[in-house]
């Protein structure tokens, strides 16, 4: 299971689709609708959020925005904040649209989860995930590797490369991350 901290526009097709499926699974786990994956380390940051289901819904919403921009068909009806989907989607000064800066990314859409509090992600985690993504893309989609470089250049600093739900903070790789050498 990989729920990327990186902005969805940086993910190649396989990573975007897999992330969508795995985050839908995360939503099921948090709702108590499945017995599997309940202790998966990728769930830690969502469980720590004051509104975990709303955070997952905000995350999924941005994945769906990127899918729409690419002409993919992700079923938004599968996104739900919980038993009362019509309820509040969070509060606070932070917004799940904070990192909306790149013309190559699907950031401009209205987000119904914009008031969900951001999740901190250490810069070291982003660096690791970007290196991991580059490694994966180099082996499976060299054409995307070129697009990835262009999109990274357009975003500028690495802190602008986070998924809009995440706020980049100083720090190393998350303790829950199972790192690989590549």
What function would you assign to each model-found segment?
Residues 1-16, 22-25, 29-33, 47-88, ...:
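Sequence termini and other peripheral, non-core segments
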């Amino acid at each position: 299971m990989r729920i990327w901290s990186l902005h969805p526009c940086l993910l190649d097709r396989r990573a975007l689709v897999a992330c969508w499926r795995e985050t839908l699974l995360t939503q099921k786990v948090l709702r108590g609708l499945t017995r599997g994956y309940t202790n998966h380390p990728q769930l830690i940051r969502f469980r720590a959020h004051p509104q975990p289901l709303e955070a997952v819904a905000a995350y999924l919403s941005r994945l769906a925005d990127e899918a729409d921009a690419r002409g993919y068909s992700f079923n938004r009806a599968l996104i739900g904040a919980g038993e009362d989907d019509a309820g509040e989607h969070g509060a606070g000064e932070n917004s799940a649209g904070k990192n909306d800066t790149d013309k190559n990314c699907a950031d401009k859409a209205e987000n119904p989860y914009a008031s969900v509090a951001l999740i901190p992600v250490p810069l070291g985690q982003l660096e690791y995930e970007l290196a991991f993504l580059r490694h994966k893309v180099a082996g499976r989609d060299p054409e995307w590797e070129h697009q990835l470089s262009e999109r990274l250049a357009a975003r500028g600093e690495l802190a602008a490369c986070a998924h809009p739900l995440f706020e980049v903070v100083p720090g190393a790789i998350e303790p829950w991350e199972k790192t690989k050498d590549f």
